[in-house]
């Protein structure tokens, strides 16, 4: 019983810390805060700071999930965001607010999320890891050119919004990709027999995937 009471007190204390961070809009990374706290305590008091730090962060992660659920966010949305931003609760809530609004207000949101899942599955299946842009000289279909040109136009503004934590604005722009992406999948066989063409098409898709992943892991969304 005493242990249960301590757990309840610890949970309330953790929720209190999270509430203070959010109310004061503190840009405080939890992992850094925990590390600095353990360093201040010293090795004489903390025998295994790495293990304790991991346990504390896991505990706060659980409390963050509870806190965000109490704020009305869906569990799958919380998981999607925390998988990309597990330590900065203020930034995580900005992402959650933007994601929830996007899924509620944009007609294309659910379909676009499904397309991003499809892209992710293709890239994972093909084990694609690229550090460069696609080569337009290898495009064979006008739909490839249109998608790449569309992405090049919006890439700069999207990047700026993401750098400034303007996630809602970034998602508004990304939503505009939906018709072009639809046409791409209707017209283009991504897994072409020619390995060079196939790799180039997958490289193009990684650019879209990367932009969405900088906000949340859309593969964890369950749909409405």
Model-identified regions with their sequence ranges:
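Amphipathic alpha-helical "coupling" segments that flank catalytic cores
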Residues: 1-5, 9-224
């Amino acid at each position: 019983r005493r242990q249960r009471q301590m757990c309840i007190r610890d949970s309330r204390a953790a929720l209190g810390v999270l509430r203070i961070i959010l109310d004061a809009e503190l840009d405080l990374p939890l992992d850094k805060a925990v590390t600095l706290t353990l360093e201040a305590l010293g090795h004489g008091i903390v025998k295994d700071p790495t293990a304790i730090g991991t346990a504390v962060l896991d505990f706060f992660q659980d409390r963050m999930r509870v806190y965000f659920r109490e704020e009305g966010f869906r569990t799958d949305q919380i998981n999607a965001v925390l998988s990309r931003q597990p330590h900065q609760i203020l930034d995580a809530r900005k992402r959650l607010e933007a994601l929830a609004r996007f899924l509620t207000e944009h007609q294309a949101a659910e379909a676009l999320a499904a397309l991003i899942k499809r892209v992710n599955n293709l890239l994972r299946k093909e084990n694609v890891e690229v550090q460069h842009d696609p080569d337009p000289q290898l495009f064979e279909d006008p739909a490839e050119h249109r998608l790449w040109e569309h992405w090049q136009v919006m890439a700069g503004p999207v990047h700026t919004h993401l750098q400034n934590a303007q996630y809602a604005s970034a998602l508004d722009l990304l939503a505009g990709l939906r018709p072009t992406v639809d046409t791409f999948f209707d017209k283009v066989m991504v897994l072409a027999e020619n390995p060079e063409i196939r790799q180039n098409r997958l490289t193009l898709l990684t650019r879209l995937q990367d932009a969405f992943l900088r906000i949340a892991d859309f593969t964890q969304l369950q749909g409405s």
